[in-house]
Amino acid sequence: MVLEFREYTKKIKKDTILELDFKVETGEILTIINNKTENLEMLKDSFRKRTKFKGEILFDNEDVSKQQLLFTKDFGFYNDLTLLKNLKIALELFNIKVSVDNLTEDLEFLNLKPGSKYRDLLPNEINKFHILFSILVDQNVLIIDNTDKDLTIEDMEVISDFILDKSNNANVIILDTMLNRYNSIADKVLVITDGIKSYYGNLEDLLILKQLTAINISNNENLETVLSGYQYTIYHENEIVVREEVLEEVAYSLLKNNIEVYQIRNLGEKIKLYEGEDDL
């Protein structure tokens, strides 16, 4: 079961076009980081073909809109019924049977009281309840929106644990405006900066990339001697890559040996992870 963005292009504004072309394999978790919530909403609309775009979003080579996609606020519940009763009734509509004991356990795991009435829930509890339902429906493509400001740190922590425990082999998409330890459970990360894809790949590679600096130099002769004791990679013919923490020492060693430094740039300069980076 593969979720695929195939030659997807979407005009964000006059001079900005979002281009996506990647696959999410069976059971993989993808976190999409975007600094603008309206762009995340646009992606949700794209999944359901409620906005125009070029290319395709496919699940097992069929249009993803044919899948049973439930977003957290898509489904209504009865105000006067308990959370446990609401879940039983709603799941029966999808021919899904879950024991009362298991439903009770799931509710309590998310710090929700099975006997509470839906109308008495706080905003963050409503969000958790809807996320619980969308996971229990056992969708092939599960989309979790973490941008809701009502969610507390504790909420996001239990949601992350619940996703890891209950998502089975679903393709999970987590939408957020920052990278943090609650969405870094992902196998892959897509970073969209001001409407443009700035990174797609493994989280570990992204964090390493953010710490690397490229130095454009006049020549690369005798680098093995000049930079003895430092780890470096020849990126292009006259460009080397070093870790940011040794930049000053490396630059000094280069200049001392008559190798001119033309330009210094951070390899991850176009990748904005926004806030929360220190929480990883």
Predicted regions and their residues:
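C-terminal coupling/interaction segments
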Residues: E244-L280
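Conserved ABC ATPase "signature" C-loop
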Residues: D194-G195
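Glycine-rich P-loop/Walker A and Walker A-like loops and their local beta1-loop-alpha1 context
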Residues: G27-R50
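Hydrophobic anchor residue at the start of the ABC signature
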Residues: I131-L132
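Conserved catalytic loops of ABC-family nucleotide-binding domains
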Residues: D161-M178
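Conserved ABC nucleotide-binding domain
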Residues: V100-E125, D138
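Conserved ABC transporter NBD signature motif
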Residues: R48, K52-K66
